[in-house]
């Protein structure tokens, strides 16, 4: 008979032999992104590396909460979500870990990554002003700040202040203009609303085409998606809308990102870094740009023809992690302004 000690050694060897290859050949991703392009990139990565990518999809808030609950027992290796504010929330909750990667530092510009190496941008979206081409001309538009001018009374359609995209836009304005001026701006926009804030970005375009307001604020990704929608009605609507990049005479148009970070308790950290590095590569960045109407973060990769048709623009180079750092201040400002 074998001794108990020998059995333990054998059992440990069996466990190690069966688990190590598994960990060496997989990476587990919690993602808020839900696009066909992401599945294509997963398949490409697995084919190139032999590393299997397991995906759990959900809303950003749900995934962050799940990571909190799971703690050290979480199977997640990577968190991918949209908006720097959400990534900063995950960082502040202690759910991410710092990584060191020369590839990521080279591919992702400094202002588009966390200064502590906790997360990196993968794509960009510009938050632009869209306008009903039958009632507004580009020369009537200028800056985000101008949206508070009384000339736009009853003419603005916009999302709720609960929306992270609006929170990040206001956070950027607080960074540039200060708290008091940003509060005055938010109050001014509220006075100019054509209706109570509601719906998603696409709904704002639908509103101004339907005559509920003349201008709205949207992320460029939604414009691209509507332009290539399977719904002919959405294509018809977006053709009646013009795209304007604000603040070209000063700091540039506000941009936000989708990004990724390695989770604090990752069991496959090396594979996680490899996957994020792959997503920052020219091959992956080209697919993001051409198929999903997003701006690449990697220099030298061209946007799609549709995205280029909206024109080139100067983008705000504010360090993107600032949006998360000022998120709570932005939420307070919206509340004070009565922006619901």
Where are these regions (language model features)?
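Ligand-binding pocket segment of bilobal, Venus flytrap-like solute-binding proteins
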Residues: 172, 177-246
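A structural signal for short loop-to-beta-strand junctions that line the ligand-binding cleft
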Residues: 74-79, 97-129, 145, 155-158
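Short beta-strand->loop
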Residues: 30-33, 96-105, 115, 118-120, 131-133, 145, 153-177, 232-254, ...
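Periplasmic solute-binding protein
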Residues: 84-95, 112-142, 170-171, 255-260
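Extracellular/periplasmic bilobal clamshell ligand-binding domains
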Residues: 305-340
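Mature extracytoplasmic/periplasmic domains
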Residues: 258-317
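Early extracytoplasmic/lumenal segment of secretory-pathway proteins
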Residues: 24-89, 340
